[in-house]
Amino acid sequence: MNRILFESCEVSNGRAVFGGARAEHVLNVLHGEVGQTLRTGVVDGLAGTSVIEAIEPLPADPATGLAQGRITVECRHDEPSPAPWADLILAPPRPRAMKRLLPQIAQMGVGRIVLVGAEKVEKAFWGAQLLKESVYRPLLLDGLMQAGVTAMPTIRQERSLRRYVEQGRMDEDFPDAACRVVAHPGAAAASAPSHGTGRVLVAIGPEGGWTDGEVALLESHGFSRLSLGPRILRTDTAVVALLARLMPIL
C-alpha cells in the first residue's frame, strides 16, 4: 500500500478510524506510531496526509503473528488525485484470472470497465461471485492503494458485444474517446496511436481471442487494430502490456 484510502463514510469531522488489513500494514510494514504521518486519501475524492492520533492494540493474528489494531488519524486531504486516462471494454477471462487482473487495472489508471459477452467467453462467467460489488470492489481498492490514487473504476456488464455496439450504447458510454484501439494478434499496426491528452478506449478479447467478425464490428465503429506481437497472451498479461504501451508519459 502506497496510500491508505478511506471510504467517504469513514471520515467524520476530519478524522478516520480503521482496522483490518490497512491497520495491519501501518503497524507491521510502516511501523506506525502516534504522531507519524501517513499518505492517505478518500475514494473518489482528495488525497493528502493523515497523522496518527491513537492506536488501540488488538490481539495479534494467530496465523501470522502480525500485530493488529484500530488506528485513529486526523485527515488533511486537499490534493487532487490523477484522473483516469483509459477506459476498457473487456471480454472477461475465467474468474481466477479476473481476480488477479482487477487490482492491476486499477493501478494502471482505467476509469470505466465494461465487461462484454463475446463468442469465446464462457457463459458460466456471468454467474460468478466475482461480479458482485462486495467482491470486486476490495480488489480494485487494493490496486488504487498500491498506485497511490483515489479514482475508483466503475464496472458494468453487457452480455452481447454486438448488441452493445450496434444499439449505440458503446457510443453513449464513450462519446469523447480520443482514440479507440482493439488488441488483435497479427495486426498490421506497429506503433501505438497518439491520443494526446484525451482518454483512450481499449477493447481486449477473451483468452481465445476475438473472432474475425468481432474485430470487423469494432473496426467499423472506429477502432484501430494494435498487435503486441505474434505470441498469444493470456488476458491478464495482454491487458497490462497494452495499457503500458498506450500509457501517456507524464
Where are these regions (language model features)?
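N-terminal positively charged helical leader segments and presequences
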Residues: 1-79
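Intrinsically disordered, low-complexity terminal tails and inter-domain linkers enriched
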Residues: 56-68, 168-175, 190-191
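Short, ordered loop/turn segments at secondary-structure junctions
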Residues: 57, 117-121, 230-231
